[in-house]
Amino acid sequence: MTLTFSMPVHSDDELGQLCTAFDTMREELLKSNQELWRQAEERKRLNAAFSHDLRNPITVLKGTIKLLRQGTADEQAIDRLESYTLRIEQYAEAMSSIQRLEQMPVRINEYSYSLLHSELEETAKILAGALEPSVSAPDKGTIQLDHGLVLTVAENLIGNAARFAKSKIEIHLERKGNFLHLSVTDDGPGYPVELIQSGPKPFGKMKEDSAHFGMGLYSSQILCLKHGGTLTLENSKSYGATATASFQINQKP
């Protein structure tokens, strides 16, 4: 059944009001179906990535077990066995974490820009204090959003920038239309081209940090989508990289 049709309303009588109510219900059903479809496609992509990235650890484990059975395994083989077992454990924990994010409800409440500004400053001080990060945000007004969700994304982006920045991080918060934009810029080496072109992947390693599995950026992307927004990554022409998270919002002047 398609829900892309519309019901034009030509009068304000009971029939017109009924048509308006049906059209509102249709729009909500369409939005719900689109979200379910997006989640199903994302789950399919995630499962494929999980299966693909498990192949190498499992192959190494099989080879090491074979050496153990033959009695030819050395201490290095035992270390390798422990290392790859830990990797599989991390993959499993990541899968569980992503599932919890997808099921997390969005709770909208009203907050002041000044509160968000101070919390961003505190987060930046904790995660990137040595880099003397700068934070800019509107001084007045309130905004309606999921406070915890937005701060979680901010923590992920600031923490990621702190790992790669050379000397500074700039954090900027602003409203554009019906969206709140949070951008985090660093002066590090920039994002890999593949990451910018394909977007964050749940288990995508970055060469600069072999312990980083891309979960921070990937989970931020999921949270932005849940809040009706997006996550975009780009490299600066002069230096560094910028991650911009957008969130659909309702704002009071």
Placement of each model-derived feature along the sequence:
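DHp/HisKA dimerization helices and adjoining segments of the cytosolic kinase module
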Residues: 35, 39, 58-164, 171-172, ...
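Glycine-rich nucleotide-binding loop
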Residues: 179, 190, 237-244
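Short conserved segment of the HATPase_c
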Residues: 191-204
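Acidic ATP/Mg2+-coordinating residue in the GHKL
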Residues: 186
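Short beta-strand/loop element within the Bergerat-fold HATPase_c
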Residues: 168-178
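Membrane-proximal HAMP signal-relay module
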Residues: 1-48, 61-70, 100, 214, ...
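Short hydrophobic beta-strand elements within the C-terminal catalytic ATPase subdomain
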Residues: 171, 231-234
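H-box/DHp (HisKA) helix C-terminal flank immediately following the catalytic phospho-histidine
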Residues: 49, 53-57
